[in-house]
Design a protein with these regions (language model features):
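Secretory-pathway ectodomains
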Residues: 1-478
Length: 478
């Protein structure tokens, strides 16, 4: 009898609560759900803000004072200062172009021609295109392609916020794929790291030359003028790549049970050989044989190769110089035009070197599984046991942020970075746990590959030796 009374009382109480909730007199469920759904802090120390977005992010980009979050069927922008949602749009793909002061967001639909350029702060359409089949986004340029048929395409270059093309060029086709944003070109393949997104650095400055693959050939386009410099067909054992203002012909020949590699770098304007190296493996072939199915590893104007002795090296794509050669047992984990980060042979530390010099910039203790990425504003290191994300000044090693977190590094900007786990994302401001932020690119003091003088952001587009820009004094190029 007692058990029946208790059960009856509970049922009566539940019925009363449901009746009160249904009539709007009192509803405990929203508060209860808020308590159940409350997010745990994504890191320690805590982030400036933390929000749960509608779906798992496909990419996250800091665009000026906003954060652009691409999801599977939508894109949204949030305030960098507060995390508040500014706008949301249905879209199957999105990509950010422009720099810190002039960003735009390109959005489009799956298998549908055209795109819109949105203002990241308001979501307002700045420019609309109804016919483009592909879009490439850079820090200082946006490219799109229109095709009247499969073999008749026009490549157009735009200032990110421009209203008229800067130049146009003819291409006999474009490889676009299902999603139109940034189809693959013949350049370099970046090093990757677990817990650090491949696009953490955001859009880069457009290289001086781009290689467009069309029907087995590579068309080399000068991005300053739109001139098509070469239309090259690779040999049977070759792979073509455009790096550092050069056309690379990478040969892999099978003999005696191994692969023999040779690199010939040519000036696309003249076709003459600029440099060559034999015996360097750029990791273009898989382990099953010598068939080259991948772009060479590298970043912007530099290449990553492995010598016959098994040591890794960083090579200047323009003149073929060895900018860094690792010691036996060291492992390169991140590289750009300025620096190389490698894991020491003892697997207990990460070492930063300035390319083209013997100077060690800094050393930091890590575990044997640590990964890293270099961005214009910070070097990001992801470590395990304990699980940490660390951002440091790439030149000095000064700590900008140190987080105890299982989250991933999704995007890095001038003043901080976005971290995320699942649908949760949060903003970490640099300086909260360390020094101030690194200077943005273009403020001087940033050498090109193996260089020792300051480069502006415009200089980044001139090639490592300014080979594609005129001498401001009116002299010879160089």
């Amino acid at each position: 009898v007692a058990k029946g009374s208790v059960r009856g009382g509970l049922l009566l109480g539940l019925a009363v609560v449901v009746a009160l909730a249904a009539t709007g007199v009192w509803n405990p469920f929203p508060g209860l759900w808020d308590w159940v759904d409350r997010s745990e802090p994504i890191s320690e120390p805590d982030v400036v803000w933390q929000v749960r977005v509608g779906g798992t992010p496909r990419s996250v980009t800091i665009a000026g004072d906003t954060v652009v979050v691409e999801q599977r069927t939508r894109v949204e922008a949030r305030s960098l200062a507060t995390g508040t949602q500014l706008w949301e749009r249905k879209a199957d793909w999105s990509a950010v172009a422009g720099g810190d002061r002039d960003p735009v967001v390109a959005v489009g639909k799956l298998l549908v021609k055209g795109y819109e350029l949105l203002d990241p702060a308001t979501g307002v359409t700045r420019r609309r295109d109804d016919d483009a089949v592909a879009v490439w986004t850079y820090r200082n340029l946006l490219l799109d392609a229109h095709c009247t048929d499969a073999t008749d395409c026009t490549l157009s270059a735009w200032d990110p916020r421009g209203t008229a093309p800067l130049w146009t060029a003819f291409l006999p086709g474009v490889s676009s794929g299902l999603l139109a944003d940034n189809p693959g070109l013949r350049g370099t393949r970046r090093l990757t790291a677990t817990r650090i997104d491949d696009r953490v650095a955001g859009p880069e400055s457009v290289p001086p030359l781009l290689g467009f693959p069309v029907d087995g050939r590579v068309h080399v386009v000068d991005t300053a003028t739109g001139r098509v410099l070469q239309n090259v067909e690779p040999g049977r054992d070759e792979r073509l790549s455009v790096v550092g203002g050069r056309m690379l012909r990478i040969a892999a020949r099978s003999q005696d049970g191994t692969c023999y590699f040779a690199i010939s770098a040519r000036d696309p304007a003249t076709g003459q050989e600029a440099w060559q190296r034999a015996g360097v493996n750029l990791r273009t072939a898989d382990s099953a044989g010598c068939a080259q199915r991948e772009d060479p590893q590298g970043a912007r104007n530099v290449l990553i190769g492995v010598g016959p002795d098994g040591r890794e090296a960083v090579i200047d794509g323009y003149d073929g110089r060895l900018l860094w050669v690792g010691e036996p047992g060291t492992k390169l984990i991140a590289v750009d035009d300025r620096y190389a980060l490698f894991r020491a042979a003892d697997k207990r530390s990460v070492v930063a070197r300035e390319l083209g010099t013997d100077r060690v910039l800094w050393t930091r203790p890590v575990s044997g599984k640590a990964g890293a990425a270099l961005t214009p504003y910070a070097a990001v290191i992801g470590d395990e046991k304990p699980s940490r994300l660390v951002a440091v000044d790439p030149r000095s090693g000064r700590e900008l942020a140190v987080l105890r977190t299982p989250a991933n590094a999704l995007a890095v900007g001038p003043q901080g970075m976005i971290v995320g786990e699942g649908r949760e994302i949060g903003y970490v401001r640099f300086g909260a746990t360390g020094g101030g932020p690194a200077p943005p690119p273009g403020n001087g003091g940033t050498p090109g590959p193996g260089g020792n003088g300051p480069n502006s952001e415009d200089d980044d587009n001139c090639g490592p030796k300014r080979e594609l820009c005129p001498d401001p004094a009116g002299g010879k190029d160089g």
